[in-house]
Design a protein with these regions (language model features):
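Cross-family detector of peptidyl-prolyl cis-trans isomerase
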Residues: 2-291
Length: 291
C-alpha cells in the first residue's frame, strides 16, 4: 500500500483530502490556454459516429436511467466502435486528466436487454480519469451534461454487439471544495496553496497525542464514506518528531489522486476516512498502535 511507511513512524500527522467515496461531485476550472490544448488532444481520440450508434433511440433525462431502443438492426460486420453525442451538454468541455463523474447503462445490441447500469445513485461509481489512451474514445470532445451513445462489437458470441449509454455528470476536482471548518486546538496547522496543495506545520516540541485524533478541515457535500468503501484521495504526511514529510506519504508531489478500499489502509487512516464526505479534507494524527 502507498501508506505502509506510516507503520515505521512514532507519530505521524497526515492531511488527507477525500475527493470521492465511491462517487464524487463538484466542478473544476482550468486556464483557457491549457484547456484548449488538452481538449483538442482528447477530441482527436474520440470514436467516430456511424449508422450503428445513430440508429439507437435513447430517451429520458440525463442523469436518470434511460430507455434504449434499437430502432435499426445493428450489423456487426466491420463494426469496431461508434459514438454519437445524443444530448449535447452545456457544461465545460472535458480535458485530458479530468476525473469524470458519469452514469452508464449497458444494453445488448441484439436483444435490447439491459445488461447492467450504475452511476445514477450517489456512491455507485468512482470518477474515471480520462486521457486520449484511457476513455478518450468514449469521452473525447464531450461536455458536462452530455449523453453519449456508443455501439461496439465484442468477441462474445452470446452478446456480439453491446450498446453503452453514458451520461457525463461532472468533473471531480483534485482539491477539496468543502466548507472550511474551525481549527482544533493542539493539532498541526495546515495551509493550502492556490491549487490546494497542503503544507503541514507541527510544533515538534509539543507532546504528541497518545491516541489517534481526527479533525475535519473542510466539510464536503459528497457521498458519506462507510468502512469498506473504495475512495479517491489525495494525502500528505509528516513525522511529528521532525515536521518533515516522509517518503511515500504524498500524492501531491508529482503524483495523482489514489484510490483504494478504506480497509486497505492502516487503522489510523481508516478512522480518518470513515464518516467523511466527498469533497472533505481531514487531518489525522496517527499513533504507533494505529500505524
Amino acid at each position: 500500500m502507498r501508506l505502509r511507511p506510516l507503520a515505521a513512524l512514532s507519530v505521524a500527522a497526515v492531511s488527507a483530502l477525500l475527493l470521492a467515496g465511491c462517487a464524487g461531485s463538484g466542478d473544476t476550472t482550468a486556464t483557457p490556454e491549457a484547456t484548449a490544448t488538452v481538449a483538442a488532444d482528447l477530441c482527436s481520440s474520440a470514436a467516430p459516429t456511424g449508422a450503428a450508434s445513430e440508429g439507437i433511440t435513447v430517451s429520458g433525462e440525463v442523469g436518470s436511467s434511460p430507455t434504449v431502443e434499437i430502432t435499426t438492426p445493428i450489423d456487426s460486420t466491420d463494426l469496431t466502435l461508434e459514438r454519437t453525442i445524443t444530448v449535447e451538454g452545456t457544461g465545460d468541455a472535458l480535458v485530458a486528466g479530468d476525473f469524470v463523474n458519469y452514469a452508464i447503462t449497458v444494453v445488448s445490441g441484439t436483444t435490447g436487454e439491459v445488461l447492467d447500469q450504475a452511476g445514477y445513485e450517489a456512491g455507485d461509481l468512482l470518477p474515471e480519469q480520462i486521457s486520449p489512451e484511457n476513455g478518450g474514445q468514449l469521452f473525447g470532445c464531450a461536455t458536462v451534461g452530455s449523453r453519449l451513445t456508443i455501439a461496439g462489437a465484442t468477441s462474445d458470441e452470446t452478446t456480439p454487439i453491446v450498446v453503452y449509454v453514458i451520461d457525463v455528470l461532472g468533473v471531480t476536482p483534485t482539491a477539496a471544495w468543502g466548507e472550511p471548518q474551525a481549527p482544533v486546538d493542539g493539532m498541526p496547522t495546515v495551509t493550502l496553496a492556490d491549487d490546494g496543495t497542503p503544507s503541514i506545520t507541527i510544533d515538534t516540541s509539543a507532546t504528541p497525542p497518545t491516541e489517534t485524533e481526527v479533525a475535519t478541515l473542510k466539510k464536503g457535500d459528497g457521498y458519506t464514506v462507510a468502512s469498506g468503501d473504495t475512495v479517491l484521495i489525495q494525502y500528505r504526511g509528516a513525522r511529528w518528531s521532525t515536521g518533515e514529510l516522509f517518503d511515500g506519504g504524498d500524492t501531491w508531489d508529482g503524483g495523482s489522486p489514489y484510490s483504494a478500499a478504506t480497509t486497505g489502509f492502516v487503522a489510523g487512516f481508516q478512522k480518518a476516512l470513515a464518516g467523511q464526505t466527498g469533497g472533505s479534507q481531514g487531518l489525522v494524527v496517527i499513533t504507533p498502535a494505529d500505524g
